């Protein structure tokens, strides 16, 4: 059985290292994008089973990245969990309305993050497909 693939969209090298240590210890394959532009190309290239997305990114914020994921037929169904230092109620509501599966505040709790990952890993969201069907026709 192959390992599940997780794309981490995060600009901070220390945080990326933290993800790598945590997730490889739990047998996940990790791929990284350090900005909004790389996020789309890495997602298309690797077709991850799940995406962890920071909101504060260079070259466009996480909401722009999320919109681009949802607008791409090959990426729209991949579950996304936001992991961000931005902890505003408005950000959480906007992210959940955009279809993210969860919102985790940095610094994250390993057990909480792993539980969310396990819960949503590989789970394609038919509601997103229904919402986007008109866009793709």
Feature map (PLM): residue ranges:
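Acidic catalytic/metal-coordinating carboxylates
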Residues: 35, 61-67
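Short hydrophobic/Thr-rich beta-strand motif most characteristic of the beta2 strand and flanking loop
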Residues: 27-34, 42, 104
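Conserved acidic carboxylate
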Residues: 10
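Active-site beta3 strand of CheY-like receiver
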Residues: 46-52, 57
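Two-component/phosphorelay signaling modules centered on CheY-like receiver
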Residues: 13-31
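The feature encodes the CheY-like receiver
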Residues: 58, 76, 88, 107
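Alpha4 helix (beta4-alpha4-beta5 surface) of REC/receiver domains from two-component response regulators
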Residues: 64, 87-105, 115, 119, ...
